[in-house]
Curated annotation (Swiss-Prot):
GO CC terms: cytoplasm
GO biological process: asparaginyl-tRNA aminoacylation
Official protein name in the record: Asparagine--tRNA ligase
Reaction(s) the record says it catalyses: tRNA(Asn) + L-asparagine + ATP = L-asparaginyl-tRNA(Asn) + AMP + diphosphate + H(+)
UniProt keyword Cytoplasm present: yes
EC number(s) stated in the UniProt entry for this protein: 6.1.1.22
Lineage: Bacteria, Pseudomonadati, Pseudomonadota, Gammaproteobacteria, Lysobacterales
Gene: asnS
Length: 466
């Protein structure tokens, strides 16, 4: 007898006529006039559930099988057979059904066999993976996570695990969560009345990381090609459907690379991810295309086929100014591009993904390399139709004197970044990298309208349940 997953059965890995054991949860059950029950069982291994044909002569048919409701856990032993019903390839002809776990009160069970609103499902995030949509999202998230590691491994990168607790603000924006074990009722004070963090666990003020980039640069300058992929945190009090307080970031870093090489890798990387998910999660993407976003599959296929357009920020501003379109946000050299500007460029004017380069120095981070014009930095944003910015990156400032000037402009204390300055003192080389918010990627692939649906347990202002 073979313990088999539903995915193995539908992919032909289990021979028809084999005796199998399947373990999963009931989606639906219905009785027939012929004295049978049809129980739909899902184990989460793929989008589909398998129909279990249950005859009335089973010893627990009346006492248990006919009382099964959505969510009950069962172990089924039976024979895999071609299905006589429409819309399904196989079924299991049951020899026994063991009920492992009952749903305590079927009437109040939150996940009923009907369509629920996304707002409601966020309130029961611990149960929402049992729905069709969030089961699909979870499998796609796994597929893309594995594809991230596969791409970098196959291209000679090393995965570096960067710290979650840090003393540095990688973005220089100050939107950080403080980490402390101090007694909030009896805080130690300095002579000037400030909090004395020398009494804290680490002996200094510490935070949750906003980016692994600064740390991973150290390894790029020793191992040449590296990346980090882990959780990051931003204490940005934003309630929009585009922001999370906790999210995952993919950040490669490449030694001896300039901005052009950075953009080339970003394009290659995104196309690899989309090609992989199209090949490996066909069933889940088909459901999303049917129920969530009808252009999902064609959008990803078009992205893969399209060469990325390259355009400088200055030229992008000129195009927007000449567009004749009235935008909600002003278009002016020196201001950052907003989502509406990015989407106009990719969807209305150019019609494919765009890499915008060389932004004004005052709207980008301190570590980005100052260009020879003294006004712009070697920064890039990859813009995608339907979402806008999906990747942000830059060539890093490898010149110590210029880095110090940039840090001073941002009001950063150089003593907190002495270790980062060391990279420029000892064998400095040009290097570049980018960041891709994993949940932003998930939103794009799955056609989601709210980023809180792209992560298992969303963390946002006034929201830290489960």
């Amino acid at each position: 007898m073979t313990v088999a997953s539903v995915e193995q059965m539908f992919s032909g890995k289990i021979q028809v006529g084999s005796e199998v054991t399947v373990r999963g949860w009931v989606r639906t059950r219905r009785d027939s006039k012929a004295g049978l029950s049809f129980v739909s069982v899902s184990d989460g291994s793929c989008f589909a559930a398998i129909q279990v044909v249950t005859p009335a002569h089973l010893p627990n048919y009346e006492t248990e099988v006919r009382k099964l409701t959505t969510g009950c856990a069962v172990i089924v032993i039976g024979t895999l057979a071609p299905s006589l019903g429409q819309g399904q390839q196989f079924e299991i002809q049951a020899q026994s059904i063991e009920v492992v776990g009952w749903v305590e009160d079927p009437e109040t069970y939150p996940i009923q066999p009907k369509q629920h609103s996304l707002e409601f499902l966020r309130e029961v995030a611990h149960l929402r993976p049992r729905t069709n949509l969030f089961g699909a999202v979870a499998r796609i998230r796994h597929c893309l996570s594995q594809a991230v590691h596969r791409f970098f491994h196959e291209n000679g990168y090393y995965w570096i695990t960067t710290p979650i607790i840090t003393t540095s603000d990688a973005e220089g924006a100050g939107q950080m969560f403080r980490v402390s074990t101090l007694d909030l009722v009896n805080l130690p004070r300095t002579e000037t009345g400030g909090i004395d963090f020398s009494h804290d666990f680490f002996g200094k003020e510490t935070f949750l990381t906003v980016s692994g980039q600064l740390n991973v640069e150290a390894y790029a300058l020793a191992l040449s090609k590296v990346y980090t992929f882990g959780p990051t945190f931003r204490a940005e009090n934003s309630h929009t459907p585009r922001h999370l307080a906790e999210f995952w970031m993919i950040e490669p870093e490449i030694a001896f690379a300039d901005l052009a090489e950075d953009a080339r890798v970003a394009e290659q990387f995104l196309k690899f991810l989309f090609k992989t998910v199209l090949e490996e999660r066909t069933d889940d993407l088909a459901f999303i295309t049917e129920r969530v976003e009808k252009t999902t599959i064609s959008k990803l296929e078009g992205f893969i086929k399209s060469p990325f357009e390259r355009i400088e920020y200055t030229d992008a501003i000129k195009l927007l100014e000449r567009s004749g379109k009235k935008f909600d946000f002003p278009v002016e050299w020196g201001l950052d591009l907003q989502t509406e500007h990015e989407r106009w460029l990719t969807e209305k004017h150019i019609g494919r993904p765009v890499v915008v380069t060389n932004y004004p120095e005052h709207i980008k981070a301190f570590y980005m390399r100052l260009n020879d014009d003294g006004k712009t930095v070697a920064a890039m944003d990859v813009l995608a139709p339907g979402i806008g910015e999906i990747i942000g990156g830059s060539q890093r400032e490898e010149r110590l004197e210029m880095l110090d000037i940039r840090m001073a402009q941002f009001g950063l204390d150089p003593t907190h970044y002495q270790w980062y300055r060391d990279f420029r003192r000892y064998g400095s080389v040009p290097h570049a990298g980018f960041g891709l918010g994993f949940e932003r990627l998930m939103v794009y692939v799955c056609g989601l309208s709210n980023i809180r649906d792209a992560i298992p347990y969303p963390r946002a202002p006034s929201s830290a349940e489960f």
